[in-house]
């Protein structure tokens, strides 16, 4: 019989170190969300995120992950508690926070270049056209879409559309990039390619990232910490798992490390335990 006691102990040691030791930049302080019909989506959510940190959130559907990110985006507000960036309470959407959804949200009648340019023009109206064009070209090159600049969304693949969405979000230089299952609809190979590209881009920009995912392998490859949500209603942060692998990360090397599977199995066990508990109740 396989002895997992030692592995679980090691993994729990990582969880105990799951609190960021750097200066808080994005702060969720005693956050509750109750809807007008009385449904309590979130309660007592507390999380400090350092500037430039990459955070992944996992949990079952309906556990309030998107609700939490909507409050960071400014699309929604806490019923109690505060969400703040750099000491400033978030009260509305702003260009310092950009969202990339699973759906691409591109204008199909506009070219790839124009889809990015419209965002740049809206945020930097005082820059010259030459400067704005340069920003668009730089970010399209960053995601490997220089040759597709004059194509329209119906003419490109799903993976390319998501690259456009990421380029558009980063082109306005946000402080926080919010990713709501951005690769969930893509095939496995395209997903891995975009994960690699996202890490390279993040390493260059070093903006703060909050990412929702249902893919534990994706979370372990990309993130600094894994925030695991309990089931709703009244969902909260169950545990925070620190991901110890050094950067830059190599997927093959990570998957050869026994600690990778310790962490992966711990996260899976957390999700299974939550699911079983709800169904037994």
Name each model feature, range by range.
Residues 171-175:
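A short, proline-enriched helix->beta-strand linker immediately N-terminal to the Walker B motif
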Residues 113-121, 133, 137:
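Short helical segment in ABC ATPase nucleotide-binding domains corresponding to the A-loop/adjacent helical element
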Residues 152-156, 160:
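Conserved ABC ATPase signature
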Residues 128-148, 200:
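Conserved ABC ATPase "signature" region
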Residues 73:
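Helix-to-loop junction immediately C-terminal to a conserved catalytic motif
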Residues 58-60:
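The feature captures the beta-strand-to-loop junction immediately N-terminal to the Walker
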Residues 81-93:
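Conserved ABC transporter NBD signature motif
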């Amino acid at each position: 019989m396989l002895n997992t006691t030692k592995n679980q102990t090691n993994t729990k040691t990582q969880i105990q170190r799951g609190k960021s030791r750097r200066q808080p930049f994005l702060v969720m302080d005693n956050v509750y969300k109750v809807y007008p019909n009385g449904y309590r989506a979130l309660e007592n959510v507390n999380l400090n995120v350092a500037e430039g940190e990459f955070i992944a959130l996992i949990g079952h559907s309906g556990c309030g992950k998107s609700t939490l990110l909507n409050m960071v985006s400014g699309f929604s507000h806490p019923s109690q508690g505060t969400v703040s960036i750099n000491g400033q309470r978030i009260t509305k959407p702003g260009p310092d926070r950009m969202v990339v959804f699973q759906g691409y949200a591109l204008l199909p009648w506009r070219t790839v270049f124009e889809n990015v340019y419209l965002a740049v023009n809206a945020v930097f109206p005082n820059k010259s056209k030459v400067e704005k064009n340069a920003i668009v070209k730089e970010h399209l090159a960053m995601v490997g879409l220089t040759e597709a600049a004059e194509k329209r969304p119906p003419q490109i693949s799903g993976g390319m559309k998501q690259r456009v969405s990421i380029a558009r979000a980063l082109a306005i230089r946000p402080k926080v990039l919010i990713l709501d299952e951005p690769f969930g609809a893509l095939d496995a190979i395209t997903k891995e390619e975009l994960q690699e590209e996202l890490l390279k881009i993040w390493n260059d920009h070093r903006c703060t990232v909050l990412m929702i995912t249902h893919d534990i392998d994706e979370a372990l490859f990309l993130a600094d910490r894994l925030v695991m949500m309990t089931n709703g209603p009244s969902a909260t942060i169950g545990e925070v798992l620190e991901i110890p692998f050094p950067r830059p990360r190599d997927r093959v090397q990570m998957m050869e490390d026994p600690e990778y599977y310790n962490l992966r199995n711990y996260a899976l066990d957390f999700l299974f335990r939550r699911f079983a508990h709800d169904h037994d109740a």
